[in-house]
């Protein structure tokens, strides 16, 4: 419960689906989304370039691609609803954009959980200048 409170406090001021996405990540991984994923590797967080450093960073690359496939939506600001059924994330009823954004976030949160065993603390707060190569295509 304390972790949930810390995440809620850290996310005050964060708008739109970033709040829901953070709560999904916490629920799937048990990790604080801000400290564990906001600056991880070359793709987690704002922007991204180069080659993903590992499977977790690849989750972020795929998530960026998913958002990129939503040109008529605003993935970082459009809010959506979701709930859990038997532990699984279920996107709620909403607009087409809300549902597609939710599905992008859901897939990334599940990807993070599936790759917890290979999460590498070396890539937390990874410096951008080490992500030199041109980005892969989605």
Swiss-Prot record:
SUPFAM superfamilies, per the entry: Phospholipase A2, PLA2
GO BP term (any one): negative regulation of T cell proliferation
Cellular component, GO annotation: extracellular region
Location(s), subcellular: Secreted; Host cytoplasm, Host cytosol
Cofactor, free-text remark: Binds 1 Ca(2+) ion.
SMART domains in alphabetical order: PA2c
Protein name: Basic phospholipase A2 ammodytoxin B
Pfam family, one: Phospholip_A2_1
Function: Snake venom phospholipase A2 (PLA2) that acts as a presynaptic neurotoxin, an inhibitor of blood coagulation, and has been found to bind with high affinity to intracellular proteins. The response of indirectly stimulated neuromuscular preparations to ammodytoxin (Atx) is triphasic. The first phase, the transient inhibition of the acetylcholine (ACh) release, starts soon after the addition of Atx and lasts for several minutes. This phase is probably independent of Atx enzymatic activity. The effect may be due to the specific binding of the toxin to presynaptic receptors.
Principal cellular location given in the protein's record: secreted
Binding site for Ca(2+): 43, 45, 47, 64
């Amino acid at each position: 419960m304390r972790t949930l409170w810390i995440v809620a406090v850290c996310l005050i001021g964060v708008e739109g689906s970033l709040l829901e996405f953070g709560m999904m990540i916490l629920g799937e991984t048990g990790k604080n989304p801000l400290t564990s994923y906001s600056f991880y590797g070359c793709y987690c967080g704002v922007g991204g370039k180069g080659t993903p450093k590992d499977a977790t960073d690849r989750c972020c690359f795929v998530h960026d691609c998913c958002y990129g496939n939503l040109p008529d939506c605003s993935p970082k600001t459009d809010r959506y609803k979701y709930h859990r059924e038997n532990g699984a994330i279920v996107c709620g009823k909403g607009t087409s954009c809300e549902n597609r954004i939710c599905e992008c976030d859901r897939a990334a949160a599940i990807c993070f959980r599936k790759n917890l065993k290979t999460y590498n603390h070396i890539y937390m707060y990874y410096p951008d200048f080490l992500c030199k190569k041109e980005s892969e295509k989605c």
